[in-house]
């Protein structure tokens, strides 16, 4: 008996009916674990065994490459080598084949290529770089809207909304708002005027018109380059089969039998393709299988109506419902059925495994505790001999995956990411790129300085830190490292000199082929210094990835330079591109993935974490205001969507399932259990309260690793790095008084102690951001005007600003043009609104300092503008570029009882004037140079009283005491990223990389 016959005999009655019904349209509603893949494969085998059809006349379409591979493997087992002739393909791959054959119907002169991810990055970057964008390219973060633009354009295409239609609907909404009587205020000061909220809506929609222009340019540039993106593919193929009778006939004649997997995930475009080819065929042999309860691709245009429509569109369709589940226990299936009922079939899933264990619902204080508990649970299972491949943690979002992976790795648990490891997630990637930058530019002081702190430099930590503290240079270069041979603190061939020599040997190979140079760097610095076999394997994989990137870059560019390659890599990194590390083998580990990605998989043990209303039900807000017509057509995250996703997640579990949630987020905000879980009957769960779960965690913490500690100092102590910490602390205590205490120093210290350490203590050079360069150019121009009391003409002003921007390191002519225009507008507004009102007796950019004898430190500040008014008052002004801050933000006292950075600055200036001149500052003000004309926050004015001075002095004393007592590393990091990003603190990341290496 063949394997096919053996497997066929195992089928139940309804499964056999699905396999045996090979003629006409058939729709199978197959719940999770009911043998869907098995049925598809056996049905293809049945067709080949009972008809004289050739294997290449069968078309099987699915949605993922993994689905294609699974089907091909199953067919090979059942049918043998003949199965290779069966056309098993994803929708997109099949569509591309049709496009390659009939591309002339799309008015392409040659076959269009599918745009690669890196090509898309550079195309978008080029459009943003060369366009005149007021909104889409923020100065603080030019790449800010990259993913939002991609996502919105993708959705518009899947909904088949053209550029013209999108623009028309935006203008229609604006016109309606402008003319709607309800838009006019009927009371108060604004009576008769457009309401403020309506003004904001109109302004937001007007900004979205920039997206229209971007969309138009993006499409034009793709077509000019004979490119198509992922969403074009299906639209193009529908256009071909709709307009070409030859193409339709070709497909229909080639494929007598069509099978579609996961049909509930079909989008409107995919459905249109099936209807265009087989819609006019009487009784077509189309077989679709899916489950309405597992529709989780609504974001990509999938809609339940397309699945339901099949039953009626292709004539008398046979409907078969499969409810016998061979995966999960009854308790798991009962819970799943309570969450969601099928809208197509009646009946509940029936388990062939029996009752099984109850599902746990666990409550925790914080989200991190959920993952710690899951990790400890899996750790105990591993110790009992359970297979790692049977364990999975499912979470709502991708960022939860990254956090969970990090926590599990800190528990020394093996983790197998569903996605390959990203090159940009590795610390050694930054190290490698630094070496390349030094070879490209040996006088790159930022890269040279940071390279000394790299693990791979071979330099002792304290030795590197002492060298940097004693050589506080803005222009530290490779030559300085080579000069360190026989002079200074270190003898002859010390580690700093050796590192310089290694870099010099690589610099001497700069003219070699790029891929050869990268191979040399990899071998000399990484592979040859591997600590053990595991480290060697990781380093080989890492270096192979870089060599592969270099080889690809060489094929696209003739004689590429290091600088060009660095620019290529940096752009990919900036835009969040994912580059897989080229792994040599498949490792084993706990699988961590989103609920969405778990579809089609199964595990004995499943832990579903972060089941909070605020987390699970949250949608990413679009930065673009959309017209009502488009909003109504876009998929919204409803209760039903969430239920389907949870249904899929729970039915991944074969025997054991746990759900967990937290009460508080990381910032202390309240969290609640997801409402769709709260609504479920208690009978489905064994509930474990927060105090019970915390007790378990504490017991494990006493008997094992300190799972509640995550500070750098605690992690360093765990890794046996206490000597290094003691040395660094003593090194700081001995030398911190050499650095003057300024308000920027204090602000850095209380934001993040490691920001202070690297910026103010070691004074590591840093690349200057575009915003800082603009701020410096504006401040320098204002200082020039104030000191010389000359109003420059427009051309002179532009020339002065341009020169200053170049001094600040801006070399791109287009960037200079953009920044120069912004700076000129700021200065012109300053001259019109502020300069004319300055007191006659004033001084600008005045440095003030004094020695605090009690603390033994110099306190210092530079005041932008000091005015002595005619009535004897002193007015201090600090000029600020960037978005204006509200009175509340400036006057806010933080949770430690400290002043905001802005108020601390004003308090410092008043204190300095009092100590150095024995005079009181009467008025302290912040003038925001980039405010809108009608912004009430353009100037903040206050008087610094003794209470604020006392808070400033407390900050200074706390600063000194924490350094003297070695407590500064214990301080909490309060870093907040700018420009809409949610990045981790770069200074803490650098510290972890150094102290935990």
Predicted features and spans:
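A basic/glycine-biased coupling hinge at the interface between accessory DNA-binding modules
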Residues: 5, 23, 45-235, 253, ...
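Non-catalytic protein-protein interaction segments used by genome-maintenance enzymes to assemble
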Residues: 843-916
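Conserved motor-region signature of P-loop NTPase helicases/translocases
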Residues: 1-73, 246, 253, 259-260, ...
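Conserved C-terminal motor-coupling region of P-loop helicases
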Residues: 2-8, 247-248, 462-488, 529-721, ...
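Metal-dependent nuclease catalytic regions and adjoining charged, substrate-binding loops involved
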Residues: 689-707, 910-997
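Short, polar/flexible loop-turn hinges at active-site or ligand-entry regions and domain interfaces
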Residues: 52-57, 77-86, 102-116, 128-143, ...
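Accessory C-terminal helicase-associated subdomains
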Residues: 206-211, 217, 387, 483-597, ...
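C-terminal, charged and often intrinsically disordered regions of DNA end-processing helicases
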Residues: 375, 379, 409-411, 491-494, ...
């Amino acid at each position: 008996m063949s394997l096919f016959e053996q497997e066929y005999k195992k089928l139940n009655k309804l499964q056999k009916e699905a396999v045996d019904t090979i003629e006409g349209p058939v729709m199978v509603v197959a719940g999770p674990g009911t043998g869907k893949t098995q049925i598809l494969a056996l049905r293809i085998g049945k067709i080949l065994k009972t008809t004289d059809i050739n294997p290449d006349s069968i078309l099987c379409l699915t949605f993922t490459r993994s689905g294609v591979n699974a089907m091909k493997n199953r067919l090979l087992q059942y049918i043998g080598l003949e199965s290779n002739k069966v056309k098993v393909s994803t929708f997109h791959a099949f569509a591309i084949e049709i496009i390659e054959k009939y591309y002339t119907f799309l008015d392409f002169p040659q076959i269009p290529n599918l745009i690669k991810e890196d090509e898309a990055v550079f195309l978008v970057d080029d459009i943003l770089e060369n366009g005149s964008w007021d909104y889409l390219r923020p100065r603080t973060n030019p790449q800010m809207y990259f993913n939002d633009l991609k996502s919105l354009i993708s959705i518009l295409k899947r909904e088949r909304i053209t550029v013209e239609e999108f623009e028309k609907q935006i203008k229609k909404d604006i016109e309606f708002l402008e003319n709607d009587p309800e838009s006019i205020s009927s009371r108060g000061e604004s009576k008769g005027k457009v309401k403020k909220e309506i003004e904001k809506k109109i302004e937001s929609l007007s900004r979205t018109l920039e997206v229209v222009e971007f969309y138009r340019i993006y499409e034009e540039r793709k077509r000019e380059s004979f490119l198509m993106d992922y969403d074009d593919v299906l639209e193009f193929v529908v256009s071909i089969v709709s307009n070409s009778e030859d193409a339709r006939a070709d497909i229909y004649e080639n494929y007598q039998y069509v099978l579609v997997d996961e049909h509930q995930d079909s989008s409107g475009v995919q459905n249109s393709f099936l209807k265009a080819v087989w819609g006019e065929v009487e009784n077509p042999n189309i077989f679709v299988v899916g489950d309405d309860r597992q529709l989780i691709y609504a974001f990509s245009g999938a809609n339940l109506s397309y699945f339901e429509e099949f039953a009626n569109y292709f004539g008398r369709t046979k409907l078969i419902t499969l409810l016998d589940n061979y995966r999960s226990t009854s308790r798991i299936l009962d819970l799943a059925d309570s969450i969601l009922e099928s809208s197509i079939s009646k009946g509940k899933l029936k388990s062939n495994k029996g009752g099984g264990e109850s599902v746990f619902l666990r409550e925790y204080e914080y989200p991190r505790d959920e993952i710690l508990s899951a990790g400890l649970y899996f750790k105990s299972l591993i110790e009992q001999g359970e297979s790692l491949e049977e364990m999975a943690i499912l979470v709502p979002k991708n960022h939860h995956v990254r956090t969970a992976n990090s926590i599990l790795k800190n528990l020394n648990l093996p983790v197998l990411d569903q996605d390959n490891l990203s090159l940009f997630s590795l610390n050694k990637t930054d190290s490698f790129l630094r070496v390349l930058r030094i070879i490209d530019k040996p006088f790159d002081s930022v890269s040279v300085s940071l390279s000394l702190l790299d693990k791979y430099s071979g330099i002792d930590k304290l030795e590197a830190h002492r060298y940097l503290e004693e050589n506080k240079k803005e222009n530290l270069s490779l030559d300085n490292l080579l000069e360190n041979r026989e002079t200074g603190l270190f003898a002859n061939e010390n580690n700093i000199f050796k590192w310089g020599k290694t870099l010099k040997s690589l610099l001497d190979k700069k003219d070699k082929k790029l891929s050869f140079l990268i191979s040399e760097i990899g071998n000399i610095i990484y592979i040859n210094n591997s600590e053990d076999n595991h480290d060697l394997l990781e380093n080989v994989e890492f270096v192979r990835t870089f060599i592969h990137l270099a080889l690809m870059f060489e094929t696209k560019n003739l004689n590429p330079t290091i600088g060009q390659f660095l620019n290529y890599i940096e752009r990919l990194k900036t835009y969040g591109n994912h580059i897989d590390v080229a792994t040599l083998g498949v490792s084993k580990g706990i699988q961590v993935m989103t609920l969405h990605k778990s579809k089609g998989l199964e595990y004995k043990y499943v832990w579903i974490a972060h089941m909070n209303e605020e987390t699970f039900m949250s949608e990413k807000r679009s930065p673009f205001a959309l017209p009502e017509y488009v909003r109504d057509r876009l998929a919204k995250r409803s209760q039903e969507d969430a239920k389907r996703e949870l249904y899929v997640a729970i039915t991944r579990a074969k025997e054991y399932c746990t759900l967990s949630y937290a009460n508080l987020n990381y910032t202390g905000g309240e969290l609640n259990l997801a409402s769709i879980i709260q609504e479920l009957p208690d009978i489905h769960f064994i509930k474990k309260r927060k105090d019970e779960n915390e007790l378990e965690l504490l017991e494990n913490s006493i008997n094992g690793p300190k799972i509640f500690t995550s500070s750098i100092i605690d992690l360093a102590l765990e890794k046996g790095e206490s000597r290094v910490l003691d040395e660094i602390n003593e090194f700081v205590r001995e030398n911190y008084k050499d650095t003057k205490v300024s308000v920027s120093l204090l602000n850095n210290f209380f934001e993040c102690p490691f920001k202070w350490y690297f910026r103010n203590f070691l004074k590591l050079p840093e690349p200057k951001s575009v915003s800082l360069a603009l701020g410096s150019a504006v401040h320098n121009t204002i200082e020039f005007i104030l000191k010389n009391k000359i109003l420059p003409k427009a051309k002179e002003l532009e020339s002065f600003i341009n020169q200053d921007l170049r001094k600040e390191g801006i070399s791109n002519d287009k960037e200079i043009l953009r920044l120069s225009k912004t700076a000129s507008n700021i200065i012109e507004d300053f001259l019109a609104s502020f300069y004319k009102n300055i007191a006659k007796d004033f001084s600008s950019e005045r440095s003030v300092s004094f020695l605090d004898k009690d603390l033994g430190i110099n306190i210092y500040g530079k005041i932008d503008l000091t005015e002595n008014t005619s009535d004897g008052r002193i007015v201090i002004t600090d000029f600020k570029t960037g978005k204006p801050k509200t009175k509340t933000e400036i006057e806010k006292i933080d949770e430690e009882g400290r002043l905001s950075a802005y108020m601390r600055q004003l308090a410092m200036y008043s204190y300095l004037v009092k100590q150095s001149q024995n005079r009181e500052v009467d008025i302290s003000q912040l003038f925001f140079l980039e405010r809108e004309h009608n912004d009430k926050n353009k100037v903040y004015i206050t008087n610094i009283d003794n209470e604020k001075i006392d808070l400033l002095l407390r900050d200074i004393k706390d600063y000194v005491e924490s350094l003297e007592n070695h407590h500064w590393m214990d301080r909490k990091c309060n870093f907040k990223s700018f420009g809409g990003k949610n990045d981790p603190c770069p200074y803490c990341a650098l510290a972890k990389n150094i102290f935990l290496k």
